[in-house]
Design a protein with these regions (language model features):
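Electropositive phosphate-/nucleotide-binding environments in soluble metabolic enzymes
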Residues: 13, 74, 119, 148, ...
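Canonical AAA+ ATPase core
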Residues: 7-18, 23-100, 105-115, 155-160
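Alpha-helix N-cap and coil->helix boundary residues
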Residues: 58, 79, 116, 120, ...
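Hydrophobic positions in the central parallel beta-sheet of the AAA+
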Residues: 3-4
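Conserved AAA+ ATPase small/helical "lid" subdomain
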Residues: 95-150
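Alpha-helical structural signal
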Residues: 16, 40, 63-64, 80, ...
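C-terminal engagement/docking regions of AAA+ P-loop ATPases
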Residues: 132-213
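Generic alpha-helical structural context detector
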Residues: 20-21, 68, 82-85, 126-130, ...
């Protein structure tokens, strides 16, 4: 149910194409025969820094299929120290236990999907994504798929917070993580060392949020 793609930006184009089919259509094709993937199904991918040996930029179409993109960075010194201590005592993987099974995850997905988002929230989402399409520092803005993903992620944030309805702060919290990796900067913006996350922050600041009723 979970496919982990390590060093995705070192994969061959044929591998990229196969993964795209799995993510978009929920199936894989082997020797001309199509096989449906189990549900739920999700992909978690890791990338090496662009410019490292053998890396390449992922196609825009594939980046658009990933719902969110997170940058891990380096661990805090305290976390790194704890990592060393755990590795010395035993293999941390030996102590991993499941926290949910397939049916539990499916039930959570249904609950998240049932989380209410008002028409005002939908209009807010569309205003945000539309703003990326006319931004002077972007040559490619967020696609309609980004709007759908932002609505889904906003529902998930609301559910985690214990609510059965979405409020504007849910959208704001997840906006950059959901949208930034789908944006393409202009050459001038790249030369000025601007980045997509900062542009998302600026768009949030300039776009009026609906009032919570």
């Amino acid at each position: 149910n979970v496919f982990l793609a390590d060093e995705l930006n070192r994969a061959t184009s044929r591998t990229q194409s196969a993964l795209l089919e799995a993510m978009e259509e929920g199936q894989v094709t082997v020797d001309g025969e199509t096989h449906p993937l189990p549900k739920p199904f999700m992909v978690i991918a890791a990338q090496n820094p662009y410019g490292s040996s053998g890396t390449q930029l992922l196609p825009d179409s594939q980046m658009d299929r990933f719902m969110v993109r997170l940058t891990m960075g380096y661990p805090a010194p305290e976390s790194e120290l704890e990592l060393l201590r755990r590795k010395q005592a035993c293999n941390p993987l030996d102590n991993i236990t499941p926290v949910a099974d397939q049916s539990t995850l499916a039930a959570i997905q249904h609950e998240v999907a049932d989380t209410y988002a008002s028409d005002d929230i939908f209009k807010y989402i569309v205003r945000l994504t539309t703003a990326t399409r006319s931004h002077p520092d972007l040559r490619q803005g967020a696609s309609p798929r980004a709007s759908v993903a932002l609505a889904s992620m906003s529902r998930a944030v609301a559910w985690v917070q214990g609510r059965d309805y979405v409020i504007p702060s849910d959208v704001q919290f997840i906006f950059a993580d959901t949208v930034a990796h789908r944006l393409l900067l202009t050459r001038q913006a790249e030369q000025e060392q601007k980045n997509a996350r900062d542009i998302c922050t600026a768009i949030l600041q300039k776009t009026p949020a609906p009032r919570v009723k």
